[in-house]
Amino acid sequence: MKMVIKMIYSSISNDKIKNIKKLNDKKYRDLEGLFLIEGEHLVLEAYKNNCLKTLIIEENNSFSLDVDTMEVTSNVLKYISKLDSYPKIMGICYKKKELEIGNKVLILDGVQDPGNLGTIIRSAVAFNIDTIILGEDCVDLYNSKVIRSTQGMLFNINILVKNLFEEIPKLKNLDYKIMVTNLNGGNDIKTIEKNDKFAIIVGNEGQGVKKDIINLSDESIYINMNSKCESLNVAVATGIILYELDK
């Protein structure tokens, strides 16, 4: 009878482990077309959506999926993880493939906070947005804080990174109605005429949407609210807008 020897990675000096650790850096993620996820929930979401390349589990963990699997010791997980309390399950994922743009589009101009981007992605899935287009100056989609904030919803929606000055005119030529959030005026989101094909543009946390981007839009919109409140967090505002558009 042949003895099967199970490989368990225990050294943080191992080249394979070092290369996995490098996926915490954007430059290496872009080079490899891969990114890291941490925790069982995210791993299961990635697996369900055919994005999981490799499962990484702590030795003697009974969790299993039909995918390439690495068993590692706790010190290796702690070395790889970005969390204070490392998870016992991690994964290496393929970066998302860009799909055809759907009829309901959310465009983000310069959103910088990882938590905001993650929350916006969750809201977009909740309110049936087909496609999210990130401007090139947005925070990296595969930033670990963004990924955790999405709670796995990044695997359930088409997300592209584009030059907005090139992409918005293309959408206009395809008969999308281009709407933009604008603190300086426009139409109440509750009163606008809805189109089957639309793109809504939301801007940076501090500066809002760039003026040159606003000039590319068909209509400015705002959320009517108590005059004592000057503004809302971008993730909160986006959630309200997407809810109204989904009615």
Describe every region a protein language model picked out:
Residues 126-127, 146-154, 211-247:
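Structured adenosyl-cofactor binding patch, chiefly the S-adenosyl-L-methionine
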Residues 64-76, 103-104, 196-199, 218:
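Active-site regions of enzymes building and remodeling cell-envelope glycoconjugates
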Residues 3-59, 138-139:
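Boundary-proximal intrinsically disordered activation/regulatory segments immediately upstream
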Residues 8-11, 70-73, 158-165, 221:
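Short acidic-hydrophobic, aromatic-tinged amphipathic segments that line or gate anion-handling sites
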Residues 72-73, 109, 135-136, 158, ...:
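Short beta->alpha connector loops at strand-helix junctions that form conserved
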Residues 101-184:
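RNA substrate-binding interface of SAM-dependent RNA methyltransferases
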Residues 180-227:
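Active-site/ligand-binding-proximal alpha/beta "capping" segment
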Residues 69-97:
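Glycine/small-residue-rich loop that forms an oxyanion/phosphate-binding "nest" at active or ligand-binding sites
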